[in-house]
Amino acid sequence: DENDPDSIDLKQVPNNATVYEISGPLFFGAADKILDIKLKEKYNVLILRMRSVTALDATALHFLEQFYERCQKKGITLVLSHVNEQPMNAMKKAGFDTLIGEENICLHIDDALNRAKELV
């Protein structure tokens, strides 16, 4: 969206990174879509932008954990951007924040892009 100052089209994404944005709540009915994200060998960082995810249930968290494991096996660091309050609370309760590493959970897309640059 050209009116969005945080549009990824206006950002410089490092060559080693790719960005996926998830929109809407992640519940069991839509959560498996996370596993549809293709992992490409040319990237060593995948930024999952979650600014529009207002809620996350246990099933979605399970799929997110599976996706994290797939990334790990391919040597890709998963970085989360703009995780809202309820999803963050669910992640903390399940220990996902510790699993992924708190340094890989960023408040803003700019922070996530800077984290990707650190991981070149």
Task: Give, region by region, the residue ranges found by the protein language model.
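The feature marks cytosolic C-terminal regulatory regions of anion transporters and related permeases
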Residues: 1-99, 117-120
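Short acidic-hydrophobic, aromatic-tinged amphipathic segments that line or gate anion-handling sites
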Residues: 99-115
